[in-house]
Amino acid sequence: MVDYQGKKVVIIGLGLTGLSCVDFFLARGVVPRVVDTRISPPGLDKLPEQVERHLGSLNEDWLMSADLIVASPGVALATPILCDAADAGIEIVGDIELFCREAQAPIVAITGSNGKSTVTTLVGEMARAAGWQVGVGGNIGLPALQLLEHPAQLYVLELSSFQLETTTSLHAAAATILNVTEDHTNRYPFGLQQYRAAKLHIYEHADLCVVNADDALTMPVRGADARCRSFGVDVGDYHLNRQQGETWLRVDGERVLNTREIKLVGQHNYTNALAALALADAVKIPRASALTALTSFTGLPHRFQMAFERNGVRWINDSKATNVGSTEAALSGLAVDGTLHLLLGGDGKSADFSPLVPYLQGERIRLYCFGRDGQQLAALRPEIAEQTETMEQAMRVIAERIRPGDMVLLSPACASLDQFRSFEQRGDEFARLAEELG
């Protein structure tokens, strides 16, 4: 634990995470200052009166006179004033670093471009099934610092690349990078390797690393070593085994669970299950408890979730697929009896959509592209694509064409903010329209 008494602390960014940092320091007798570039940031009404705040811009005088700067994950370390502060020897951390300095229980740390919320939640459920006191949070649910307020035998943290950039004291009992695909190109101007380098921080000081045997970018820089266990579709210590039309989860050559007993849908979710099982084994969660949790877990909202089914047509809400890799995962190994009606569109964040092309082949697929980058997506295979301005317009076209055995899949490969407040609102709208039109 670190003594912060007498330190001049400035917190950049309010919101839930910023407020958790304020509470953390107040509980230790330190009154921090808060700066936020927004005039009316979320959580402002909950900020205690004694905490000085500067809104609408970054207060350079405060930052350059600080002993410690706690930066929100949304603030790039490349921001000029933070570069100046770092050059001046001022320590810059994030909330996860503060958490790691205080945590007294083992930590399972999970990152990746896609699937991390599902795996984080699933490992937490596995621990609960064993009767453990577990704190689950970080980039999902509760801010990590709030987890310190309750006793825990295990912490399970979802961590973003942004959070890992400001973390040096993480000593995970088990850590994983589930996958690495292009994302956040605005934050990582030097491309995929810069993004991957941020993710790789998770393996530093980890007792055990769980790597994706199908994705070399998830490997530690020095390659797999004695600390590593692997998962994958067909290879890895934890992999899928297909026999006589059935698919099993297999660990070290032993079949442990038939996927028919799992409520999660799709090959990408089966590999998520394998990763969760590997992490659970690493921290000695009893296997029986882990499998019990796995068979009862229904998944997270907006993540390849069945929104509606009628007359043999399934409407699948995968609105959380805000990047190309997520949509690739959804389409990989997807089985549809009839035609797949795929909804793509939104704000692609300057991403390269071409990796989707191999998944868009065949006669039984139709594309419906909408939003800011709808035209670019329709160009991937124009002969089967239809472009509309909005998702609702596209769904009304689909409703006229569906037949029993078809699937309507919203897996947009794009952020939602060009037309929606959030991916959640986009998914809710899809579900509402599915029920109306189905």
UniProtKB/Swiss-Prot annotation:
Organism listed in the record: Pectobacterium atrosepticum (strain SCRI 1043 / ATCC BAA-672)
Pathway named in the protein's UniProt entry: Cell wall biogenesis; peptidoglycan biosynthesis
Catalyses which reaction(s): UDP-N-acetyl-alpha-D-muramoyl-L-alanine + D-glutamate + ATP = UDP-N-acetyl-alpha-D-muramoyl-L-alanyl-D-glutamate + ADP + phosphate + H(+)
Record key words, sorted: ATP-binding, Cell cycle, Cell division, Cell shape, Cell wall biogenesis/degradation, Cytoplasm, Ligase, Nucleotide-binding, Peptidoglycan synthesis
Name the record gives this protein: UDP-N-acetylmuramoylalanine--D-glutamate ligase
Record GO terms (molecular function): ATP binding; UDP-N-acetylmuramoylalanine-D-glutamate ligase activity
Subcellular location as annotated: Cytoplasm
Residues engaged in binding ATP: G112, S113, N114, G115, K116, S117, T118
Top-level EC class: ligase
GO terms of biological process kind: cell division; cell wall organization; peptidoglycan biosynthetic process; regulation of cell shape
A single cellular component GO annotation: cytoplasm
EC number(s) given by UniProt: 6.3.2.9
Upper lineage: Bacteria, Pseudomonadati, Pseudomonadota, Gammaproteobacteria, Enterobacterales
Keyword flag Zinc-finger: no
